[in-house]
Regions:
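Active-site capping/gating regions of soluble enzymes
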Residues: 1-128, 137-138, 142
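Acidic, glycine-enriched catalytic cores built around paired aspartates
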Residues: 130-186
Length: 186
């Protein structure tokens, strides 16, 4: 697995920090987070770029009781069973990606999704305070992450915001490369 801690700074000022908020996030942070949540299925194509990536996401619980990989698109406070957790005020941890992710595409796609959230003032909804590994069936309407690479590539292909941010030619080339790898695997 892999994760990224995300905050936005203006000089020495953390723009994601709001000490008056219960989780310590500013309105800006929530909108940025909303963009990441909205685009999560498409981001999965960058964050989980191999067939084995989806074996990790869909892995059964281990002896510890968890795979420590998210499978639902959700966020929470300091709880590692969700795709996004807020461990401390002023930042959030995105837990979706794995070690096969290209670090440059990872950062660029998080920024593109976050900027979409800021531009469109996307509300991420309420955080869920539960153990998603045990309680996921209580949330049947909660969006799930793609089960396979080809599903996330299809989401990316049809995501106008990501196509605008990266350019359609770059997205098409990325998808073509991943599809060639899928074809070789089969």
């Amino acid at each position: 697995g892999c994760h990224a801690h995300i905050s936005v700074w203006d000089g020495k000022k953390n723009k994601f920090l709001d000490k008056s908020d219960g989780l310590g996030l500013s309105k800006m942070a929530y909108n940025f987070l909303g963009g990441v949540i909205k685009n999560a299925s498409s981001l999965s194509a960058f964050f989980n770029p191999t067939i084995n990536s989806y074996r990790r996401i869909n892995a059964p619980p281990t002896k510890s009781g968890a795979s420590w990989s998210p499978s639902s698109i959700s966020y929470t406070g300091n709880n590692r069973t969700h795709m996004i957790r807020i461990p401390d005020p002023g930042r959030f941890e995105l837990r979706l990606m794995d070690g096969a992710a290209n670090p440059y595409l990872l950062q660029a796609s998080v920024l593109a999704a976050g900027l979409d959230g800021l531009k469109n003032k996307i509300d991420p909804g309420k955080p869920l305070d539960c153990n998603m590994y045990e309680d996921y069936q209580k949330y049947p309407d909660l969006p799930k992450l793609p089960d396979e690479l080809d599903q996330s590539l299809e989401k990316l292909k049809n995501n106008k915001d990501m196509n605008d941010a990266f350019g359609k030619e770059a997205i098409d080339s990325y998808i073509k490369l991943r599809n060639l790898e899928l074809k070789e695997f089969k």
